[in-house]
Each structure stands twice: as structure tokens, then as C-alpha cells.
């Protein structure tokens, strides 16, 4: 019999711009920040009884190699008896970490888990494969920041290897999402995020990152990707990235960013035993596959699968956190799900276009934000969903306690 699973605490670092304030911080150190904060915020917990640390991370080609979850928990000061594992479903890695924790606890295999995600896109290295022969000269240097590398020729022949902005333009073409609508969606995200930041909403979920340097310490305590003063006119002037007849621009797409997130999940027994406060209940998670060329539409079948499983409808949710990989896919997804473009439930404090998209952390960030927003608004249920590179979608639902 499945057991109820609760989210008891959740924090994140600020989200840094590419090459910004967090670029000097290693991914394993960055991942340790929110994990350590959870430990310090909950001193009554016997952390030697933590069953697992699940962290999502998408790239894993640099300092985030060798199981960054395990390294992060050790760097955070947890006992070496606590195990950790890194999950990779690209953009949804952090959401998968939360979902994996949920399933472990629901099945009775775990009682107390930390889940979350991390990505340092600024520090993603250039890599090169080994030569096929001695002194070979055909090697190619690959940028691991985002997108395809070491492409399988069969994959390319069968499915194509469209870059992420190309997949967004494919969705815009297939679902008739105009440039004007995309720019309006992006402006809404920036304005809402700007208002939320000015009101101090994000301060409730952020733990500062302290960076030590030759001239002393620098404290990073606020998201730095936002452009709340942008306008429709400014967005309209940006050139499409895939050619003049296309619609996706740097202004209506998410950023390339750095950040990390961690949440405590527990069974009812662990909540009582460790003196935790149950803030939200995880209702379930679902995933689905779509054609890689239109990966951005992936949330639609994932949400439908989850809602059918839970016997709920979109109307039953008070907060909908949709990862804004691109405005084109965000609008296509909401329209396919019967959600109005101006529905106030969707990303009420802005989304990834404004806040940024540190790949492995973003899915966990959606869950964290949904829990905070439900508490702030008094809503009951939150729906979190996101598209995934190579053609997938993931959705996860929570309910305020």
C-alpha cells in the first residue's frame, strides 16, 4: 500500500547569469549550499538516518562528474554513511529527483530523503573524444553547456538533431504560436518576476551563496537573470536565432544559468520522529515521450497521464508552475491543455524566461516555488511540468497540507 509523502522544507540558491556571480563556484560546492542549509535549518533531525540524497544534474562533464550528489552531501557535512545518487533526465533531472524520492518513500523503501538538483552551466567544460587511431586528427571539441554533442549518426538519420531553439520554432510552426504572442508571454514573465523580487517573495526560498576571494567574501543573495524593465518594443527588435522567417529569440527563451535546489521529503512517521513540519504532500509524478523535434510539447501528454492517474483536471489546481524553456512551447502547452494565455495560475511569480533555467535544478525549483506559492496564496494544489530535450515531458503534483 502506497504511503503519503510530505515536503517539509525547501530552499535554493539564487540563480546566476551565465558567466555571472556564481560562475566561480564549482557545481559540487553549489549543490552543497542548499543541502547544508536544510541541515542547519533542521538541527533536531538525526541526519545519520537520512536514507538517500537524490540530485538531478544534466551535464556532468566537468566538476559535476563522479556522482555530484554524493560529493555534495559530503561537502555539506552529512555523515559518510548517507548515500547519494545523481539522476539525469536532462531538463527534468531535478523534478525526477523529487519524484524518485517520492516513490522511494511511498513504497516503504525510505523514510527521509533530500532531493533536488544542480547545474553550473557557466563552468561546463569543452570536451574532446579519444582518437580512433594514434595521432588521429579528426577529433572535434564539444561545448557541454547545452544541447547535442557526440551525436550518434543513426539518431541523426532517424530523428534529426535539432538544436533546442530549432525545436521551439518547430513547435511554434506546428501549433501556430506567433512572435507577438511569444514576446507578450516573455514580457509577462519578466514583469511578474520583477514584482515578486521587489516584494521579497524569492527571499523566502533563497539561501545566500558566500564566495571567498582574495579581496574578501562576496555574498550572492538574489536572482540575477531578470530583466524586469524590458518592453514589448525591445523584445520585438531582437533577431530570431534560426533565421528571419522564424520567431524564437533570446528574449522569448529561457537563460543559460547556474543554481541549485534541495528539499526534504519524509513519510508521516519520519515527520513525527524528526520533529519536521509537513508543508505539502506529493500526489504523484508522470512522464511521457514525444518526437524529439517538438520536445517542447512534452508536458501535454505528461500532464494528461498524471491527471488521469490522480482523477483530477487542470481546473483542480490553484498554481501551475510551467518551465518556460521557450515562450513558444509554453503557449503551445497551455493552449493544448485548455489554459488561457492570461491564466493567473500559471507562473504567478514569473518563470524561467525571467529567472533562468539551470538545467538540473529547474525541475526541483518548480516544486519548491509551487509549495511556497500555495502557502502564500492559500491555494490547495500545485501542478509542476516541463519539457525535456530529446523529446519528453514530466509532470508532478503537490497539495498543501
Swiss-Prot record:
Pfam families attached to this UniProt entry: Thiolase_C, Thiolase_N
Keyword NADP: no
InterPro entries found in the cross-reference section: PcaF, Thiolase, Thiolase-like, Thiolase_acyl_enz_int_AS, Thiolase_AS, Thiolase_C, Thiolase_CS, Thiolase_N
Catalytic activity annotation: succinyl-CoA + acetyl-CoA = 3-oxoadipyl-CoA + CoA
Active site: 91, 357, 387
Keywords: Acyltransferase, Aromatic hydrocarbons catabolism, Transferase
Cited PROSITE patterns: THIOLASE_1 (PS00098), THIOLASE_2 (PS00737), THIOLASE_3 (PS00099)
Pathway: Aromatic compound metabolism; beta-ketoadipate pathway; acetyl-CoA and succinyl-CoA from 3-oxoadipate: step 2/2
Any one GO biological process: 3,4-dihydroxybenzoate catabolic process
Presence of the UniProt keyword Acyltransferase in the record: yes
Molecular function terms from GO: 3-oxoadipyl-CoA thiolase activity
Domain of life: Bacteria
Transmembrane segments: none
EC number(s) recorded for this UniProt protein: 2.3.1.174
Matches recorded under CDD domains: thiolase
UniProt pH dependence: Optimum pH is 7.8.
Subunit annotation: Homotetramer.
PANTHER family in the record: ACETYL-COA ACETYLTRANSFERASE, CYTOSOLIC, ACETYL-COA C-ACYLTRANSFERASE
Family according to the record: Belongs to the thiolase-like superfamily. Thiolase family.
Cited function: Catalyzes thiolytic cleavage of beta-ketoadipyl-CoA to succinyl-CoA and acetyl-CoA.
Protein name stated in the entry: Beta-ketoadipyl-CoA thiolase
Gene encoding the protein: pcaF
Amino acid at each position: 500500500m502506497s504511503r503519503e509523502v510530505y515536503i517539509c522544507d525547501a530552499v535554493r540558491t539564487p540563480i546566476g547569469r551565465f558567466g555571472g556571480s556564481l560562475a566561480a563556484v564549482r557545481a559540487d560546492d553549489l549543490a552543497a549550499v542548499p543541502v547544508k542549509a536544510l541541515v542547519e535549518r533542521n538541527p533536531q533531525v538525526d541526519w545519520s538516518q537520512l536514507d538517500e540524497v537524490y540530485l538531478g544534474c544534466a551535464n556532468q562533464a566537468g566538476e559535476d562528474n563522479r556522482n555530484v550528489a554524493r560529493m555534495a552531501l559530503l561537502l555539506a557535512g552529512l555523515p559518510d554513511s548517507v548515500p547519494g545518487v545523481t539522476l539525469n533526465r536532462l531538463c527534468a533531472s531535478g523534478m525526477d529527483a523529487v519524484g524518485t524520492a517520492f516513490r522511494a518513500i511511498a513504497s516503504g523503501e525510505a523514510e527521509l530523503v533530500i532531493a533536488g538538483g544542480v547545474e553550473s552551466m557557466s563552468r561546463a567544460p569543452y570536451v574532446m573524444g579519444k582518437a580512433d587511431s594514434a595521432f588521429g586528427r579528426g577529433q572535434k571539441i564539444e561545448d557541454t553547456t547545452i544541447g547535442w554533442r557526440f551525436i550518434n549518426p543513426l539518431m541523426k538519420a532517424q530523428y534529426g538533431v535539432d538544436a533546442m531553439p530549432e525545436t521551439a520554432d518547430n513547435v511554434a510552426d506546428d501549433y501556430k504560436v506567433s512572435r507577438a504572442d511569444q514576446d507578450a508571454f516573455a514580457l509577462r514573465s519578466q514583469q511578474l518576476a520583477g514584482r515578486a523580487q521587489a516584494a521579497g517573495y524569492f527571499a523566502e526560498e533563497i539561501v545566500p551563496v558566500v564566495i571567498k576571494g582574495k579581496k574578501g567574501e562576496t555574498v550572492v543573495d538574489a536572482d540575477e537573470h531578470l530583466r524586469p524593465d524590458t518592453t514589448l518594443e525591445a523584445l520585438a527588435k531582437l533577431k530570431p536565432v534560426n533565421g528571419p522567417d522564424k520567431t524564437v529569440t533570446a528574449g522569448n527563451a529561457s537563460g543559460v544559468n547556474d543554481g541549485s535546489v534541495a528539499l526534504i521529503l519524509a513519510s508521516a512517521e519520519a515527520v513525527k520522529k524528526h520533529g519536521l513540519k509537513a508543508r505539502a504532500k506529493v500526489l504523484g509524478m508522470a512522464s511521457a515521450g514525444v518526437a524529439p523535434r517538438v520536445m517542447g510539447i512534452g508536458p501535454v501528454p505528461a500532464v494528461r497521464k498524471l491527471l488521469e492517474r490522480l482523477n483530477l483536471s487542470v481546473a483542480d489546481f490553484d498554481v501551475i508552475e510551467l518551465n518556460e524553456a521557450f515562450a513558444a512551447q509554453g503557449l503551445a502547452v497551455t493552449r493544448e491543455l485548455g489554459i488561457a494565455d492570461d491564466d493567473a495560475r500559471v507562473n504567478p511569480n514569473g518563470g524561467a524566461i525571467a529567472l533562468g533555467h539551470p538545467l538540473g535544478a529547474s525541475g526541483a525549483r518548480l516544486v519548491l516555488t509551487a509549495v511556497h506559492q500555495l502557502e502564500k496564496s492559500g491555494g490547495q494544489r500545485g501542478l509542476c511540468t516541463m519539457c525535456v530535450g530529446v523529446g519528453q515531458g514530466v509532470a508532478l503534483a503537490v497539495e498543501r497540507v
